[in-house]
Amino acid sequence: MKILIALALYSLALLACSEPVGEVDTVFKLIGPDHKIVVDAHDDPRVAGVTCYVSRAKTGGIKGALGLAEDKSEASIACRQIGPITFAKPLPVQEEVFSERISLIFKKIRIVRMVDKARNTLVYLTYSDRVIEGSPQNSVTAVPVDRGTPIPLSGK
């Protein structure tokens, strides 16, 4: 039982937190906050030196203020090398590095890292999904890693 709890806590630690970068208003709302586009930074928790920037719509108004609104599924991602890229441990070929709820219960936005071993490149995909059905809307970006630093892969 203790092992399961430790694994669950470790898994939560791997899902990085987002840091707000900025926002712009898109629609004025007389009551409650305006509709916005928000930009958040997400540091990859297992790849030092890579940060992903995600922009997405955030619903305002009364429902938005109360946390009852469902944000749109569209998002855009741009990941960049912000320092020397290092790996503490081998990476799986594909791994979710971040997820955040964007509606009260049903919808999440996700960032998944994939390793393109042939090109020594990290590929990041963002999309949203629901409990039953996701959205085909997505955005992808890639961060090439210097050939002198091969990406270590785990057996997963």
Model-identified regions with their sequence ranges:
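C-terminal motif of bacterial Sec signal peptides marking the signal peptidase cleavage site
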Residues: 15-16
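C-terminal partner/receptor-binding element of secreted or periplasmic proteins
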Residues: 119-156
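Local beta-strand/beta-hairpin segments that build beta-sheet-rich folds
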Residues: 20-29, 59, 76, 82, ...
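Broad, structure-driven detector of short, well-ordered beta-strand segments within folded domains
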Residues: 37-41, 50-52, 111-113, 121-126
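N-terminal export/targeting and maturation segments
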Residues: 19-61
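Mature extracytoplasmic domains of secretory-pathway proteins
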Residues: 51-117
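Positively charged n-region of N-terminal signal peptides that target proteins for export
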Residues: 1-4
